[in-house]
UniProtKB/Swiss-Prot annotation:
GO biological process: copper ion homeostasis
Region forming the signal peptide: none
Gene: ctpA
Protein name (record): Copper-exporting P-type ATPase
Organism: Mycobacterium tuberculosis (strain ATCC 25618 / H37Rv)
Binding-site positions, Cu(+): 25, 28
Stretches assigned to the HMA domain: 14-78
Biophysicochemical property: temperature dependence: Optimum temperature is 37 degrees Celsius. Active across a broad temperature range.
């Protein structure tokens, strides 16, 4: 997609968006970005999460030239035909491609492993053309199925870098070359007597090692791609939360429905109850209650009248508004919030995979050891073929197939156990930060509170009963769809019939109940000056807590006050206390008013409160905390929490929350119980410990076998044993996570990690 934008000093700037394919990690995104930024007059930013490169240039740069530059770097690029976001899922496509490669590789691996061992250990079983049969079965696995690793390894070589793919590719290639040399070389098979002599002296056919590494790593990469797809699906669906169509008001007063993306600035459009506001703008006519909670965190609907501002992405609850568009499309606050989420996720993805960090040191070390091994054999007077064989053996044994299982197995077991506890772990990259989390930031509406208004108190004037006041109010409010009315109506089942019902926008409702005129609404409308002192005291108390005070009047006489509030979750206080017991600092960050925020913080035990803050402000607070050296976990549920969840070191979203929050978070709390927040932190930490221990197992056996290979004593039995044992211990160690947590969800008690060592260890 190519658009004209306004740059600095009002200069015309051309913006081009390219969809990049072939990137396997954030390092790839950096390479593409660096390649594009080397072009004159080009400023590029590449988002690995969305696979989109956004290029701003003050020159007439041809998009084809940009695509060609990306291709020279080893990737594919095409011009975006939309706004850069697409319904397609690159991670899902990648997972499908990996599954096809995995299925074919797994089918071929079984006969390759059987025949390699049989022909190597028992030469008498070899038949005419056995070399061709074995090679025909193995080569598709080590070439086509393993091509994703070879492609990245070659790209890394061009950039003088090393990653996990480099290690895998080198190991597979070395094992394949050695095997081809063994099976096609003019070697006469040596007949051996005794089973141990046959096993320990078997010919060096390592096709099963090369194929096994390919299969095991493909398994891990497939599950990793699936997890990425699931993690990104909510963010890709974010655009669905905005309005699709808008009713534009024409000069003659008629309306015309057009696609929302065709709306222009200064055009007027109509919004009715239940509809989503299509753009940021100014209300010019009408009055309506607007649910702003998704954008600002304000629990109570906001009454918008002519001259009031409205925000795109919010929902009109009642009334009708005519709005003049001030910001449309990518310029709206909603679109800006989407960009904040994407940018924050892209920054979080900059952390390299743990395996890549290890490989960046391990690969050069192995190559040096292999070279020293060959040199040592030659200096010692060994034959050149023995020197080359020993060097290749070092490369073969250095590639641990369990490396591909180290992270996926831990994540699979942790995800299964987490599901039992009401916790869903979306990915492992950001979980590395959990070991150092020292600050937990909570949103208020929908996180610490239910997000639904409820009656918190009823105060009756002398001569009236609280139940009587509530019943009269509920009878009238039952005919209204206002959120406060719904809360009052739901507070009791005791109702009579109502007649002459009227709803006065911005004031309240009225009606006749059993021949008595009843009004329910704002104190200013009812006439609070003539109220009994206890009613005025109840109003002051409710408003000091950030609650809404609703007055009830019968036949012109004020008879009671009903306090309505966003109820605090029962599990909130215990969760905050559990975090404090773990030595964690807690904060409340909300767009709601200071009085309401302070009241909720006091009830749940949080000392630090920042209220009346916009979504961008939440991101700023998170960044300030991180700049001071804090490692921050954020717990939220709304659209307005998305950017902060993505920017935090660890984001936790309530499962019933919006797609934005879920898309931005690293951990989803499936059930609406906050007592699993500390347990989620514990599970994330335990998972990362398991992943790291798996890495030790994955590398440990192979590192121990390197001296054996360098000494020229390596054979398929040793290589196969190292592969099998390292994989076995990785899986066994991951299964320990099934013991995590003492209590299942719903018992009301947060259990600490209960992990025991596997019996095999």
């Amino acid at each position: 997609m190519t658009t004209a934008v306004t740059g600095e000093h009002h200069a015309s700037v051309q913006r081009i968006q390219l969809r990049i394919s072939g990137m396997s990690c954030s390092a790839c995104a950096h390479r593409v970005e660096s390649t594009l930024n080397k072009l004159p007059g080009v400023r590029a930013a590449v988002n690995f999460g969305t696979r989109v490169a956004t290029i701003d240039t003050s020159e007439a740069v041809d998009a084809a030239a940009l695509c060609q530059a990306v291709r020279r770097a080893g990737y594919q690029a095409d011009l975006c035909t939309d706004d850069g976001r697409s319904a397609s899922d690159p991670d899902a496509d990648h997972a499908r491609q990996l599954l096809i490669r995995l299925a074919i590789a797994a089918v071929l691996f079984v006969p390759v492993a059987d025949l390699s061992v049989m022909f190597g250990v028992v030469p008498a079983t070899r038949f005419t053309g056995w070399q061709w049969v074995l090679s025909a079965l193995a080569l598709p696995v080590v070439t086509w199925a393993a091509w994703p690793f070879h492609r990245v390894a070659m790209r890394n070589a061009r950039h003088h870098a090393a990653s996990m793919e480099t290690l895998i590719s080198v190991g597979i290639t070395a094992a394949t070359i050695w095997s081809l040399y063994t099976v096609f070389g003019n070697h006469s098979p040596i007949e051996r007597s005794g089973i141990w002599q046959a096993l320990l002296g078997s010919d060096a056919i390592y096709f099963e090692v090369a194929a096994g590494v390919t299969v095991f790593v493909l398994v891990g990469r497939y599950f990793e791609a699936r997890a990425k797809s699931q993690a990104g699906s909510a963010l890709r669906a974010l655009a669905a939360l905005s309005a699709k169509e808008v009713a534009v008001l024409l000069p003659d007063g008629s309306e015309m429905v057009i696609p929302a993306d065709e709306l222009k600035e200064q055009q007027r459009f109509v919004v009715r109850p239940g509809q989503i506001v299509a753009a940021d703008g100014l209300a010019v006519d009408g009055s309506a209650a607007v649910d702003m909670s998704a954008m600002t965190g304000e629990a109570k609907p906001t009454r918008v009248r002519p001259g009031g501002q409205v925000i795109g992405g919010t929902t009109v609850l009642d009334g009708r508004l005519i709005v003049e568009a001030a910001a449309v499309g990518a310029d709206t606050q909603f679109a800006g919030m989407v960009r904040l989420v994407e940018q924050a996720q892209a920054q979080k993805a900059d952390a390299q995979r743990l395996a890549d960090r290890i490989s960046s040191v391990f690969v050069p070390a192995v190559l040096v050891i292999a070279a020293l091994t060959a040199a040592g054999w030659l200096i010692a007077g060994g034959q050149p073929d023995r020197a080359v064989s020993a060097a290749l053996a070092v490369l073969v044994i250095a590639c641990p197939c369990a490396l591909g299982l180290a992270t996926p197995t831990a994540m699979m077991v942790a995800s299964g156990r987490g599901a039992q506890l009401g916790i869903f772990l979306k990915g492992y990259k950001s979980l590395e930060a959990t070991r150092a989390v020292d600050t937990v930031v909570f949103d208020k509406t929908g996180t610490l509170t239910t997000g639904r208004l409820q009656v918190s108190a009823v105060t009756a004037a002398p001569g009236w009963e609280a139940d009587q006041v509530l019943a009269l109010a509920a009878t009238v409010e039952a005919a209204s769809e206002h959120s406060v009315a719904l809360a009052i109506a739901a507070a009791t089942t005791r109702r009579d019939a109502v007649t002459d019902f009227r709803a006065i926008p911005g004031r309240g409702v009225s009606g006749t109940v059993s021949g008595r005129a009843v009004r329910v609404g704002k104190p200013s409308w009812i006439g609070s000056s003539s109220c009994h002192p206890n009613m005025r005291a109840a109003r002051r108390h409710a408003e000091s807590l950030g609650e809404t005070a609703v007055f009830v009047e019968v036949d012109g006489e004020p008879c009671g006050v009903i306090a309505v509030a966003d109820a605090v979750k029962d599990s909130a206080r215990d969760a905050v206390a559990a975090l404090a017991d773990r030595g964690l600092r807690t904060m409340l960050l909300t767009g709601d008013n200071p009085e309401s925020a302070a009241a909720v913080a006091t009830r749940v035990g949080i000392d630090e409160v920042i209220a009346d803050i916009l979504p961008e402000g939440k991101v700023d607070v998170i960044e300030q905390l991180r700049d001071r050296g804090h490692v921050v976990a954020m717990v939220g549920d709304g659209i307005n929490d998305g950017p902060a969840l993505a920017r935090a070191d660890l984001g936790m979203a309530i499962g019933r929350g919006t797609d934005v929050a879920i898309g931005a978070a690293d951990i989803i709390l499936v059930r609406d119980h906050l007592d699993v927040v500390p347990l989620a932190l514990d599970l994330a930490r335990a998972t990362m410990r398991t992943v790291k221990l798996n890495m030790v197992w994955a590398f440990g056996y192979n590192i121990a076998a390197i001296p054996v290979a360098a000494a020229g004593l390596l054979n398929p039995l040793v290589a196969g044993a190292a592969m099998a044992f390292s994989s076995f211990f990785v899986v066994s160690n991951s299964l320990r996570l099934r013991k995590f947590g003492r209590y299942p969800l719903g018992c009301g008690t947060v259990g600490g990690p209960q992990m025991t060592a596997p019996s095999s260890a």
